[in-house]
From Swiss-Prot:
This is Leucine-rich repeat-containing protein 18. It comes from Rattus norvegicus (Rat). It is found in: Cytoplasm. The gene is Lrrc18. It comes from the Eukaryota. One of its GO terms (biological process) is intracellular signal transduction. Gene3D superfamilies: Ribonuclease Inhibitor. The keyword Cell wall biogenesis/degradation does not apply. LRR repeats lie at residues 28-49, 51-72, 74-95, 97-118, 122-144, 145-167, 168-189, 194-215. One of its GO terms (cellular component) is cytoplasm. Keywords: Cytoplasm, Leucine-rich repeat, Repeat.
Amino acid sequence: MAKGGKSPKGKKITLNVAKNCIKITFDGRKRLDLSKMGITTFPKCILRLNEIDELDLSRNMIRKIPDSISKFQNLRWLDLHSNYIDKLPESIGQMTSLLFLNVSNNRLTTNGLPVELNQLKNIRTVNLGLNHLDSVPTTLGALKELHEVGLHDNLLTSIPAGISKLPKLKKLNVKRNPFPKPDESDMFVDSIKRLENLYLVEEKDLCSSCLQKCQQARDKLNKIRSMAPSAPRKAIFSNLVSPNSTAKESQEEWSV
């Protein structure tokens, strides 16, 4: 802590510095990488680079994200993990091109998540792990394109059934929350393994071609089951960044 109780000044990011931090990803996207630079205040100069596709401000000391972040209308990928953020701005709902949002390892509470998050209709991945959420934001239930959700290492005691009904949800991490029943998180994750429709009929009620298709599907399912490894299950959310408070490079330590 600096003299007088003030937070230490972080590295000053100028427009030229930011321009030099723009990288081209393997798929041709423009990524502005300002991670691990000791930044304490959101650098407003980067708003002039609103043509970028991806923004990485992770592993800094940022406390507040300004409303003006919505100027990044083309942004598809936003990584803010491992900062000191306790609230997201309402304007984040205007960033409708977002596909990926990582705000893990911050100081977010449920009240710090604006209802405007439900406007992110295209978002596929949201990581809210390692925060202070005591309930699941109801806004998540409106995000029908969600494939992956991280809620691990929070203060959750229950998960709304509506989350498991998200039509495209494939991966959910709710580990290390204070659920009343120790196995509740596993039971909830298992509920995502859904069947669109299930009908019980007898063989005599099926035509020969339908019966053949059912038998083929059954054989395929049995084959998949026989190939399943008997070893302990691996991380169901290991591809999302969720570092600890010291922002270590190795994410293996945080796999679940």
